[in-house]
Each structure stands twice: as structure tokens, then as C-alpha cells.
């Protein structure tokens, strides 16, 4: 005699929860095995080995009765096979164990005569139907694993060879594999004993499903999801008889109905209402989900199942008709639903954002809306990826391509964010609701129960006490709520009250069941909001539809009207974590890497697109800024002049000339210009980038704004260098003033980006522009400073040294003295103070310092050459130094000097470089005085008032970096010192002899016809006047390095030597030697003027100033006579 079953002892509720979770875990593992076996790269290596090919064929053919004696090929590798296939094999063993547990539980539920009704015992019915569908899906996916027989047979053969006996579970496992070759046939046989239970569950779905599977027009008529449709009840809490049923997934119900009725297809002829929902489900889709991206072409599958059943031709005809309807109408119906939901969710989001307090009474609306939207997205994904097998001729799949999908995704994310943000508002509301209304109502209904068994009474009391004990203070104190025991107790109660012989039947206390169902929803909102959000709006399915996810993102990126919603795609990557299962930890790493990789790619592409739009706008603004430059007005002035002169040949082209500002004239605002469209696209894309400060995926936080900052920074740096337009071959470069105008226009556009996105654009400017003052940027690329450094030192100054370009003291620029065309560029356009100020603005003190160091390096090289010339003439120079008061000896010894012209040439080159450096420093001082006047004045004070020694050296370096003139140039001194031998006692003598060499060589300049002094440019035609700067700077630095503190004495000695040499020139009778004598006299005057150590009184004592005054008169007159004025 069979023992009686006590329902209270069967723990049906607990078993349903555990088996559903375990079934999902095993389904995950079987799914991964199927994917691995279907991919040649990831399948177990043994299945592809040529040496095992015959053995595997033998195993598959004889499966499951395999004779291992004929499998000699696997004897030596049996241990490796067991190790490699162990996980696969034990997954199938777990499936067999799961199958046994499911069958046992279903049998127990049948024996207890449980009645299922989703409107009353929601959890019990839902978990039962979920378990059935998971079980069916498992068996169908199992039948799709390609190498299942090979894997199991190979493992078992290796196991038997190693242990001399087969695995104990293999016979049953092998039989299960054979039984489920055609899974639905076997499953239908298994479920014959469970038809009563399955029938009650499916029949209860008829009313719920009919209200859910409606076209968009019906939703509009019902004002579904509308908060403003009936303002009178706006503040009232939403209450329905089937609270939990409101947000069941329609996709889940489709699977319950289709798979349930495939197992119990006799119902189709017995219950018309069931047949109606069956056909409705079949007409709304042509594929049904099994798991993730595994789907079933359901109509063909049903036809194949019904084909062998007598009298089912009518059913097969209905299925075919449903398939045709689905192919023709389903896509349009679902498209209209998505269209409705876009508007409905947007309205919900706007109202809830404005009045978050409504999240309390109207929370269910949020979850219903999310659930409906998620169902439509899942439908679109699966059907887009699996188009109908038999397409109608000429019918396109345009309804399966939704360009507005990002908007729907965005509104879902917006609502999810609102729920999380105002979770405490919802908690506060429902804690009061539970304690103030639900607990009171439950107490009243408990008192009205005429008969209540002890177990049920204890649970009811516990439920009441839990709800009644809640207070608002718990919310204010951020106390963690935990209502899982509450919900589990209600689940147990459903089981006790649904058995056939229950003393307290749930069907007779429907109102009590509905109250507890609504209380379950309220507790979930209080303690389990995240789980509700996952249940209603999880989109982790995108992880398995990689291509469509990527395609939708790029489609959105290319469609400006949807740009603002593109942030939804990175946000969805945070959902991917939800699809992992603890029973399959090995896939966790892959899903994690996938989600991190995708969110990074998406944010990078969004930032790049925004950067490209900004760059296009910047280019246009730079073009317009360039059009405002003075050089472009010549054409307009020329045409206007021609008009006045009535020159028709020129004036007819006036209309073709586009004036700056013409782009601002419009006939109508409706005609969008390219710039309008770009600004609109930028606004939309920046809205998306600015939508959330961080996107949290797994344990990482991604900042969209930082992606934009980095892209802008990189592009700005690259474009800054590009705008220099430096051509290595032709050595052409942009004028600094024009570059500065373009940079300012570019920066003005970037500044406006702050109006759209909360980014620190000043930080971008500082990073980029500061890098441009260095020789290389952070990417190792050349900078503006480096390019201009190269051009000025290698192009401009070399051209000056070659002749035809003169440094003009009064114009403060290098000017050409040859006819136009002899020099490939106008040096004045690059070297006047305005241009150098622009250069100083661009490269700053750091860039100028780098340029200065380069120039000093060139000077140091020239000085080294001069020292070698001194060494060659050492003895002669020593004699000249000691005999400056003996004219005859000086004359004779001077004739013995070698390379006099080379000395003068190198000193001139040094002078040109120093003059240019002084110009650059003057421009820098002007810029700093404008930018940092107080700091610059402090630097000047330090320079002027600090005592000598190390302190003055530091102050001089600081002053030099700021562009201020110093008695001795610290950079030049440092550079020369680096070239000097560490222990060289003759360095001072060399400096003295070099000074003598230059002093006695100066008169020879008078022989040169290009040494003529041009008053109009205040300089000599061959830049001889630049020697004044060279003499003062070079000798000052050299004597400072020697450290003998005799600079002033040595410069007096130089003046004595130079003046006596020039005075002897006055006694020279050779006209060739005195050709430009007056011009050279002026050089002596310039040396004294520029020297910090010499004075005019000292000059007067050595050289009559009347000669200099007469020289000035003479060169002015001579220039007028020759007509050399520029």
C-alpha cells in the first residue's frame, strides 16, 4: 500500500525555485557546449583529429553500446580525453539528474491534485510553467548538439579503458540521448500523466493573454500607460486584481502557450478559448526563443510534430494559415507597437522627471511600459536575425529594420535611471502602504476566515506582523529591507491552499489571494527594485546578437535625428552581466570582456563622430577667419577701383567675389545650411555624451565626456601642427599672425562645445598649447615650436647670411634689399614685431626659450670655429696685442694675419643671430606685459635690485626666459661653457686674442663695397652693423666664463684696439681700403651704444666723436646721391 502524501511536507515551492534556477544553469552549459561543438576553432581537439576519425565514426554508429576493444587509437590518450571531455560529460549527467528531479516534482504535484490558476496562485503557476518550458527547451537544445554522441561515447570509452568498467550513469545517459533524437515526441509521451495540471495552468492564461497580445490601436483606445488620460485618479495608487500578471513578459507567455500545447495538444479541440490564444501566439511570430539566440522556426516544427498524428490535418492547416498571417502582418503589428511605446515611454519619463513623487502610486506603469518595450525589442532582434523561410515575392523586410529603435532603448534607460534615482521615494511610499493599508486589510480578511489550519495560520500571522511592523523611519535611516522570507511564505501558502484536499482553498478566497499578490509586488519595490528592473527591462540579449547591436549603433550614428539617443547602446552593455549564471562560471570572463570591449568601442566612436563634426565646423570657421585677413581685401579694392574708373572688364567680376559675412544672409530660416545641420548634429550628439557622467559596466566606470576630451585634445594638437603648413621640401610655412588667427578661430569653436557638454575645455587648451611650446608633444610628434624653430634657424637666418636680406634697426625687422623675386619669400612678413608677437603668443616663453637655445647652439659652433682661427694666428695676435701703440709694427703684423675675412664673416653671422634673438625677446616682453604685467614687473625688480653672485645669475636666467635683456646672456654663457674644456688655463688668453683679432680686423670691412651704411634702414648692406651685438654678447659671455671679473677692462682694451685701427684707416692713402670708411666708423659708435660696459665718454677719449658725426652726414648724403633708398 502506497504511503499517503502530505503536501505541507513536500516543499513544492522550494523545489520549484531551485529546479528553475538549476534548469537555467544547465541550459546555459548545454548552450555553450552546442556553440563550442558547432565551431571548429572551439570544439574539443579530439573530435577533429584525423587519427581518431575512424574511432569516432565507430562510436557514433554503435552508440550507446560501444565495444572498446576495437578502439586501440584512444588507448594512449585516454587520460587526456577524460580530462578534456570531463566537463562536457558531467554537464550531460547533470541534465539527466535534472530530468529525474523534474519528473519527480511533476508527479508529486499531480499526486497532490494541485490546481493552477495564474490569477490566484501566480508564483506557483509561473514557476511551474517556467520549469516546463525550461525542460522542453533543454531537450530541444540537447537534440541540436552536433557531437553529443561522439563526446559521450569517446569519454565513456576512455573511462572504461582506464577503469576497466563503464561509468555507472552512462547506460541511462545514452538512452536519454537516443530517446530525445526527436524531443517533442518523447516529451509529449512523458507529459500524458501531467495533462490535468498543465491544462489548468494553460486555461488560466486565456484572459491574461488576450489582454496583453493586442495591436497598438487597442492600446491607444484603452489609454494604456497614460497618466494624464484620467487626471482625477492621477494621485491614486494603481490596484488591479492581477498585480503580478501586469508585467509578465509576453514572450514568456508565448512560450508557455506554444510549448505547453505542444505537450498537451488534445486541449486544442476541447477548449475553444485555448485554441484562440494558441493561434494568436502563432500569428504574432514565426520564431520562438529557446535560449538566448537559439530559436525555433515554430510553425515548421509544429507541422513536423503533427504530421504523424491521425486526424490533425485541420490543425496543420491552421498552423500554415497562422504562419502566412505572421509573415504578412506580424512585422507591421510589432512596428506599430514600438511606435506607440516610443511616445508612451517618453511621456512617462517626462512626467516622472517633473513629478518624481508619482513613482510611488504609479510605479506599476513604469514596469508595464518597460516590459512591453523589452518584449518588442526581443521580438525585433530574433525576427530580424531569422527572417521567414518562405518570403512573399516582392515583399521586403523593411518592417524588420527600425531606425527609431535607439529612441525606444533610450526611454527605457531613462525610466530605469529614474527608478534607481528615486528608489527612496518609492520605498517610503510602499512602506507606508504596506503598514497603513495592506496590513490592516490583511488583518480584516484573516479575521473573516471561518477555518484556518495551524500551519496556514502561523504563516498568515507572520505575513501580517512583517507588514504591520514597517515604519518610515527605517527608510530615513537607510535600513536594508529583506522581504524574501515574506514572499517565500506566500509561495508556500499558495501550495498549501491549491492542493485538492486543502482545508483552506485558494479559489474560495480569491480576494485574499489578490491582496497578498499585491503585497508581494509592494515588498519587491521596497527591497528588490534591481531584480524587478532586470525582470522587466533586461536587454542582455544584445550580447548574443553582436552584429545587429553593432549595426543599430552605427545606423543611429549616421542618422542625426536619433543621435541624442545613442547613449543607450553603451548603457545596455551594463546589462550583459545579468545573463551570466553561477553554474557556468567559465563564460563569465568572455561576457565581461565582450561588454567592456563594446562599451569602449561605442564611446570612442561617439567621441570621434563629435570630434569630426567639431573639426568640420572649425575648418569652416578658420576659412572665414582667413577671409577677414587684410591680404584678401586687395581683390575687392581692385574691383571697386575699376568700377570708379568704369573698367567693365574688371567690374563685371565683382559679383563673383564673395565677401566675408555673406554666409549670414538668408532668404528664409527654413533653408538649413551645411553649418546649421552640423550644429544640429553636434547638439544632438553632445546631449548623448553629456547624458550621464559615467557608464558603469561590471566593476569599471566609463566617462563619455573624458572620451570626447581626449579626442578633442588629440585632434586639436594634430590640427595645430597642420595649420602651420610646413613643407619640408619647399621650406614654406604659414605666417605666425595667420596661424594665430586660425588658432583663435579654432579655439572659439571649441569654447562653444562647453555649451553642449560639461567638459573643461580650458584644460584641453592648456594641455595642447603647453605641449606645443615643447620640442615634441606627448605622442612624440613635432610641435609648432619645433617647426618654427627649424624654419627660423635653418631657413630665414641662412637666407640672411647668404645676402640680399638686411636687419633694419629702425624697422625692427629683416628686410630685402634685392629686386622682388630674388628671395623666395618676403622676410619682413615673418620677422617684424607683429609676426614675432604672434609667434610668442603661440609658443610662449617655453617655445621662445627653445628657439633661443637653438640659436645659441649655432653661435657656439661659430665661436668654436673662431677659436680655431685664433689658434692658427696666436703668435701674431699676441704681438698685435702688445704693439697697439706702434703703428708700423701693427701694420706689418696685420699683413701676417690669416683668415681675416672668415673671422669677420662669422662675427657677422653671430651678430645676425643675436639681433634676431633680441627681436624675438622684445616681442615676448610685449606679449608678457600684456598677459602678466604684474609678474613681469616683479621679474624686472629682481633683475635690477638683487646683489651679485649666484643670486644675480638665477635672476638673469629668469629675466632671460622672460625676454628681458641682461648684461651677459646666461643662455649664451651656458652654451659656450658646455663647449669649453673643463681644465683649460689658456681659455682666457684665447678670448683676449679673439677680441684682438676682431678689433684689428674691423678696418678691413671698409674695403667691402657692401659695407655701405643705409640710413633708411639704419644698417649696413652686408649686416656689418650686427657685429656690434655679436662683439658685446660674445666677449661678455666668454670673459664671464673665464671667471676673472675683467669684462669691463677687456672691453676698454677692445675699444682702444679698434679705435686706433680705425684712426690708422684715416691715414690710409689707398682709395680701395677707405671705400666705406665712414660706414665702418658708425660700427664703432653702434658697439659703444649697445655695450653695457662702454660709455660715450670713453669713446670720445679714444676716438674723436666729430669723425662719427661727420660719418653720419656723409653716408646720408651718399645714399641720396646713389638713390639707394628703399
Curated annotation (Swiss-Prot):
A GO CC annotation given for this chain: neuromuscular junction
Residue ranges crossing the lipid bilayer per the database entry: 989-1006
Pfam families per UniProt: Nckap1
Function: Plays a role during growth of the oocyte.
Major localization class: membrane
Subunit annotation: Component of the WAVE complex composed of Hem/Kette, Scar/Wave and Cyfip where it binds directly to the C-terminus of Cyfip.
Stated family: Belongs to the HEM-1/HEM-2 family.
Disulphide-bridged cysteine pairs: none
Membrane topology according to the record: Single-pass membrane protein
Compartment list: Cell membrane
Gene name as annotated: Hem
Keyword Cell membrane: yes
GO biological process: actin cytoskeleton organization; axonogenesis; cell adhesion mediated by integrin; cell migration; cell morphogenesis; cell projection assembly; central nervous system development; chaeta morphogenesis
Keywords, in A-Z order: Cell membrane, Membrane, Transmembrane, Transmembrane helix
Protein name: Membrane-associated protein Hem
